[in-house]
Amino acid sequence: MSGVKYEVAKFNGDNGFSTWQRRMRDLLIQQGLHKVLDVDSKKPDTMKAEDWADLDERAASAIRLHLSDDVVNNIIDEDTARGIWTRLESLYMSKTLTNKLYLKKQLYALHMSEGTNFLSHLNVFNGLITQLANLGVKIEEEDKAILLLNSLPSSYDNLATTILHGKTTIELKDVTSALLLNEKMRKKPENQGQALITEGRGRSYQRSSNNYGRSGARGKSKNRSKSRVRNCYNCNQPGHFKRDCPNPRKGKGETSGQKNDDNTAAMVQNNDNVVLFINEEEECMHLSGPESEWVVDTAASHHATPVRDLFCRYVAGDFGTVKMGNTSYSKIAGIGDICIKTNVGCTLVLKDVRHVPDLRMNLISGIALDRDGYESYFANQKWRLTKGSLVIAKGVARGTLYRTNAEICQGELNAAQDEISVDLWHKRMGHMSEKGLQILAKKSLISYAKGTTVKPCDYCLFGKQHRVSFQTSSERKLNILDLVYSDVCGPMEIESMGGNKYFVTFIDDASRKLWVYILKTKDQVFQVFQKFHALVERETGRKLKRLRSDNGGEYTSREFEEYCSSHGIRHEKTVPGTPQHNGVAERMNRTIVEKVRSMLRMAKLPKSFWGEAVQTACYLINRSPSVPLAFEIPERVWTNKEVSYSHLKVFGCRAFAHVPKEQRTKLDDKSIPCIFIGYGDEEFGYRLWDPVKKKVIRSRDVVFRESEVRTAADMSEKVKNGIIPNFVTIPSTSNNPTSAESTTDEVSEQGEQPGEVIEQGEQLDEGVEEVEHPTQGEEQHQPLRRSERPRVESRRYPSTEYVLISDDREPESLKEVLSHPEKNQLMKAMQEEMESLQKNGTYKLVELPKGKRPLKCKWVFKLKKDGDCKLVRYKARLVVKGFEQKKGIDFDEIFSPVVKMTSIRTILSLAASLDLEVEQLDVKTAFLHGDLEEEIYMEQPEGFEVAGKKHMVCKLNKSLYGLKQAPRQWYMKFDSFMKSQTYLKTYSDPCVYFKRFSENNFIILLLYVDDMLIVGKDKGLIAKLKGDLSKSFDMKDLGPAQQILGMKIVRERTSRKLWLSQEKYIERVLERFNMKNAKPVSTPLAGHLKLSKKMCPTTVEEKGNMAKVPYSSAVGSLMYAMVCTRPDIAHAVGVVSRFLENPGKEHWEAVKWILRYLRGTTGDCLCFGGSDPILKGYTDADMAGDIDNRKSSTGYLFTFSGGAISWQSKLQKCVALSTTEAEYIAATETGKEMIWLKRFLQELGLHQKEYVVYCDSQSAIDLSKNSMYHARTKHIDVRYHWIREMVDDESLKVLKISTNENPADMLTKVVPRNKFELCKELVGMHSN
C-alpha cells in the first residue's frame, strides 16, 4: 500500500469544496494523518507530545499542498491542521441561510439542455445534493427523484412517464438506473429497418425509433432511404423525378410503389384510411400461424387480419383496396369484430378489424386501441397494454416488430366464459322466445350450436302464460316520432328499491323503440313526458307529431294539454272502454311485466327488485327482434348502428366484482361477491347488488357464474320485505291504480320491444324530482337538470359510490305535515307557535293600505335532536319570505353579531379551571321580541286564516323569523335589557356580557342568537338572572349546559376538567358521504398528496364527472368540525378548500383521506382544565408550501387552561422570499390574535404577568426585536412590522421554542405520525 500514489486536485476556491474535502480526508486517512482533524481529538497517552505535533504539522502541510495560492492566502495565519480545516469550512461551506438558499436555487433551477451529456448533468445534480446534505439540508428521496426528472429536457418526457407509471413512491436510485440504461441504449446504432410505417393520402411517415413512452409518441420523419438516392415514382428508375420522366405516365391504378432500402411494402386504402406498413421480406417469414401471433403497430389506424374465421361479427362488402409492395392490389373483403384471449388471460375485443386475405400476419393497431380507451407502453423491448390499473396484454420485440400471442375466443367483457348454449342465451335475453333467438343467430348477432332448441322453461310459464290473442292488423308509421304510444302501469304491490310503484312507457311507432320511466306517483307523468320530449327531439333532430294515450287523469290535465298545444303535438286519446286503440302500449306493459316476473322468479330475488328487473328487461327488449319490424332490431332501427350481445349475462346470477387496489390493502380480498341486476350506462359495464353493504355498485371488471343464482340466505330480512336501507322511501300519494296487466284479448301482436328506464327518486322540493339512471345501452341521455340531492357515484370514479341514506326527513310544507307519521306532534307545534305570536302581539289583522304589498310567509318544521341524535322536540316556526323585501322600504340596517367560537371555548376553559357553574337557556321565538321600525304587512299564515277575514292582511308589530332585520332587532332588544341590568358588554366580543359582584364573584353571559350560556360561581345570582330574563322574554331553562352549537359538553367537576366533542356530528358526516366503514388513516393528509391546480379538470367531460361529486358539501362539513373542535384537520381542510371552484379527482381523494382520518378519530375531543388559566401562543410557517403560487402558510394556535381555544391555518397574502420572512409574517398574524385575546381576558378581569408567543425561528425573533438583516428584509410590507411595536412596549414577547415542541407545526404542513400525535397532545386533544 505504501507504494501506491494517490492524486487529489488542488482546490482553487470555486464550487466543489464538498467533493475536495471528502477526497482530502480520504488522502489523510491513507497517510494516517486524519486523527488531528477531529473536533474532540486529543493526544493519545501513549504518544509523545513531539510525535503529536509532528503529526499535526504533516497533516497541515498536506492540506496546504493541495490548495491553490489564492486559497492559501486566506488561511495563512492558521498553523494547525484543525484550524486550517475549520477555516476552509467557514469560508467555502458556510451553513448560513444565504448559502442554503443559493444552493437550493441552483438545484431547483438546474436544467439539462438538449444534446447535453447526461452523465455530466447527473454529476452536477449529485454534487448539489451532496453540498446541501453537508449543510444539514435533508431532501426526501421522492423529491430528489422528481427534481432530477424535472431537470431533464422535453425529449425525456415519455421516459419519465414510463418510469412514474403505476408507482405511488419512487427513489432517486430507481430514476438514476433507468436514465443510465436509457443513455446506453441511446448510444446504440440505429436500426436500419423500420418496423411499421404509416401512409395516408399518398404520403408515408416513418415511426421514430424511440420506443419509450406511450403509443402516441411517434416520430414524424418522412419515409426515405438512409442513402439520398431517390427513384422516379413513374418508372422506378434512379436519376430523375416523375415530372422529368421520359417514359409514358402510368394510370392511377398502375403506379409503382416506391421501394426503398428497407424493403418496405405499403398497404393503403383508396379512401385514405391509414392502415400500416410492414417489412415484408424480413419480418413476415419469421411469423407463426396468424391464429396465435399478432403484430402491434402504433402507426396503423385499423386492425387487420387475413383469416376470415377469426371474426365473431362480420360484414362483407367493398371497403376499398390495399396496395402491396409488389405493386399489386388486394381488396378489403370485409369488416368486423374479433375477440381474443390475451397472454395474460384477459379478453380483448378488437373492433372494426379489416379482413385483407393477402396479408401474411395479424395486425393490432395502437391508434384503434387508444380510441377505445386503452393505453400502450413501449420500454426495454417490451410492450404492455393497460386500461386503468388492469394489464390487458403483453408483448416483446423480436426483430424489428413487437409481437404478442393470443387465442381466439368469443368476447365476454373481461369475464369468465362458460360454454354458450341456446338455453343460456334464452336466460341472458330475459327469457326471449326461441324464434327471436333464431333470428338473432341468423343475423350473426349471437351464436350457439346449430340444431339445438330451447328446453321447456318453467319460469316462462310462471311469468308469461296468457290467453291466445286475436289477430288484428296494424299499420306502422314510416318516419320516427310521427306517432308515439304511452301508457302507465301500476301500482305494484310493493315499492321498488327507490320507493317507486309505477312505470310509464313511451313507444315510437316507426322503430318500436321504448322508453320507460319509473315513478312514485302517476302525477309525475307530465314531468317525465317533458323530459322524454326534449330527449328524443334533440337526439333525432325531428319533431314529435302525435301522442296516443288513454283517458287517465295523468294525461288529461290542463297543463298537459297546454304543453302539447304549444309544441304542436296532436294528443290522441282513446275512446273509453276501447283499449285496443292503444294496443301497442297496452301490450308492451304486459311484455315488460311478464319478463320481470320470469326474471325475478328464476333469480329468486324479492319483489322489491322489480325496478331493477324492469330496467334490465327493457334493455334486453331494445335488442330483441320485433314482429312489426319484420324481425329487425328496434335499437338498430332507431340509432342506425350495430348492436352488440357479447356482454350480456343472466339476470340474478352470481358475480364477483374486482376491488381496485386503491380501495383495499395487500391482504384484503381482490373481489367481492355480488348479484348481477343489470347493465350500466355504457355497453361494457354492469350493475351489481352487494348483499353485505346493501348497496348497488357498478363495475366493468367482473367474473360471472351464470349457472348459479343467489339463495335466500344471501339477502337480509329487510331486503326480503322490500325495505332497502340505502334508499329513502316516500309513500305514493296517488289513489288511482292502473291495471298492471292488460286483460284485453284483441290487441296488436307487438312482440318483444326495446326499452329504456329512468327511475324516479324521492321528491326534494315542490315540483322537483330526482331522476336516477337511464339504461339506454350504448348511448346515454342524462336528465337536462342537475339534482339537488347527493349524487350517485361518478362513473369514472368508482370510489365515490353514493346512495341515499335513510333518515328522518323533515316536512317542508303543510301538505306534507298532513301525511307525516308525526302529524299530531307537528300540528301541536304549529298551534304553540300561533299562540306565542298572539301572546306576544306580533301582528294584527288590517285592511291592506293602498300602494302597499304584503309579504308571503311559510311554515318551517324542525325535528330537534340531542347530542346522541335522539329526537327531543318538534318545532314549527312561521317564517316571512324576506327575500321579497326591498331595501329602503322594508328595511335599512341588518347586521347583527353572534358570539365568537373562540369566546365560547375561552369561557368554557375558564369555567373548567375555576370550577364555575355553566347553565344554558333558550329563548322561545327570540326574533318575535324585536320591535319593528318599518311598516310591514304579511299574508295570513297558511292553515290559520280567519273565517270571513281572508281578504285581510297581518300588520307586523314585532319582527318575525325571515325578516332581514329580525336578528338585528332582537339583538338590540336583548342588549337594551342587559344594560338595564347593569351588565357590561365587552368591546372584544359584543355578545359577551360581564358583571362583577365582588372580587371572586362574577357572571358571564354568552349570546348566540337565541342560545345562551351563563357562567358564574354563585348559583343564587345565576338563578336571579334567569328569573329576570324570564320576566322579559319567553325563556326555556335547559339546566347545566350539555350541548352548544352541535358541540357536546362533558364535565368532571372533581378533577376540574371539561371536554368538547363533535363525535355524533362527525358520525353523521361520515354516514352522509358513505365513509362510515372506510379504512382509517393516522394523519389527516398524506405526504404523497401534492395538490395543485394542474389537477383540476379541463375538459367538459371531466367537469361533468366532477359535478356529480359532492365536493363542496364535504369540505363545508369538514370546515364546521375544524372551526369548532378539531384543530388537527385545520391544515388539511385549508388545502382542499383552495380548489372549491374547480375540484379534480385527486382533490376529491384528499377529501376522502380527511374523512378516513376522522373515521379513526371520531371520539377525539378538546380537553380543558387541570392546569392554571394561562394564555400561550404558538406560531409557525411553511415556506412556499403552495405549489401553484409559491405562497407560504401561516399557522397559529393558542392554549388556555391546557386546551386549544384559537387556531388558524391559511395562506399568506404575499410571496415570502425567505423562511425568515415567512416566519416573521406568521408571527405578526399571531401577535394580532394574542392582543385580541389579551384584551378579552383583561375585560373579564383576568391578568397574567406576560403574554408569550413561541416561535421556532430565531431569525424571525431577532427581526421582531430589531431592524436586522436590512438588505434582505427592506422589502417587507410595513404592516408586518407592527409586531416590533408590540414587542418594544412589552405588550407581548416572542420567545424561541424547539420545532419538536411547537404544536403549530401541524397547522402548516404534513408532519409524521409521531410528531402529529405529539402536537395533538400539546393542544389538549384526547380520544374520548
From Swiss-Prot:
SMART domains, per the entry: ZnF_C2HC (SM00343)
Comp. bias regions, Basic residues: 217-229
UniProt domain Integrase catalytic: residue ranges: 473-642
Catalysis: reaction(s): DNA(n) + a 2'-deoxyribonucleoside 5'-triphosphate = DNA(n+1) + diphosphate
PROSITE patterns, sorted: INTEGRASE (PS50994), ZF_CCHC (PS50158)
E.C. number(s) listed in UniProt: 3.4.23.-, 2.7.7.49
Native species: Nicotiana tabacum (Common tobacco)
Protein name in UniProt: Retrovirus-related Pol polyprotein from transposon TNT 1-94
Signal peptide: none
CCHC-type ZnF: 230-247
Record keywords: Aspartyl protease, Endonuclease, Hydrolase, Metal-binding, Nuclease, Nucleotidyltransferase, Protease, RNA-directed DNA polymerase, Transferase, Transposable element, Zinc, Zinc-finger
Composition bias, Basic and acidic residues: 241-253, 770-798
One GO-annotated biological process of the protein: DNA integration
GO molecular function: aspartic-type endopeptidase activity; endonuclease activity; nucleic acid binding; RNA-directed DNA polymerase activity; zinc ion binding
Any matching Pfam family: Retrotran_gag_2
InterPro entries: DNA/RNA_pol_sf, GAG-pre-integrase_dom, Integrase_cat-core, PolX-like_BBD, Retrotran_Ty1/copia-like, RNaseH-like_sf, RNaseH_sf, RVT_2
Biased amino acid composition, Polar residues: 729-742
Region (Disordered): 189-265, 729-800
Active-site residues, Swiss-Prot/TrEMBL: D297
